Amino acid sequence: MTYNYLLILIIIYVIKIICRYFKQKNELQMESKTNLDSSKLVDPINQVNQINQVNQVNQTNQTDKIIVSFRGDKYDITDFLRKHPGGKNILIKNNGKDIEELMAEYEHSKNAYLILSKYKITEK
């Protein structure tokens, strides 16, 4: 009789473990569904356009020029390096890249966007 009792306890324990596993799995699935933010989804067409913009910028870059892309346009900001309040290194580091996310990440005044517009070298 004690053997049967022990066997029943083991079966109950295993069932609890299995139930806990499925409960945790379900909670993780629900959490991932609720955390899904459509604004974070990647738009494949937009991503291809950004890659093309970067490739175009890279093709036009010369070693002594700092050219960046912003909202589809290209800017030669070489002459602005010494004037940039955040230092020239961040501009050099982003040579040949799209800086739209970078501009949004660091707070810029309206004047900063006006200054950038003076360095535009191409239209969309």
Swiss-Prot record:
Question: What highest taxon heads this organism's lineage?
Answer: Viruses
What the entry lists under InterPro entries is as follows: Cyt_B5-like_heme/steroid-bd, Cyt_B5-like_heme/steroid_sf, Cyt_B5_heme-BS, Cytochrome_b5
Listed GO cellular component terms?
membrane
Q: How does it sit in the membrane?
A: Single-pass membrane protein
Transmembrane spans: 5-22
User: What is the annotated localization of this protein?
Assistant: Membrane
Q: Which UniProt keywords apply?
A: Electron transport, Heme, Iron, Membrane, Metal-binding, Transmembrane, Transmembrane helix, Transport
Give all residue intervals belonging to the Cytochrome b5 heme-binding domain.
49-124
* PROSITE patterns for this protein: CYTOCHROME_B5_1, CYTOCHROME_B5_2
Positions contributing to heme binding: 84, 108
Annotated GO molecular function terms are: heme binding; metal ion binding
What role is this protein assigned?
A: Membrane bound hemoprotein which function as an electron carrier for several membrane bound oxygenases.
Family statement drawn from the similarity comment of this UniProt entry:
Belongs to the cytochrome b5 family.
Q: What is this protein called?
A: Cytochrome b5-like protein
Species of origin reads Acanthamoeba polyphaga mimivirus (APMV)
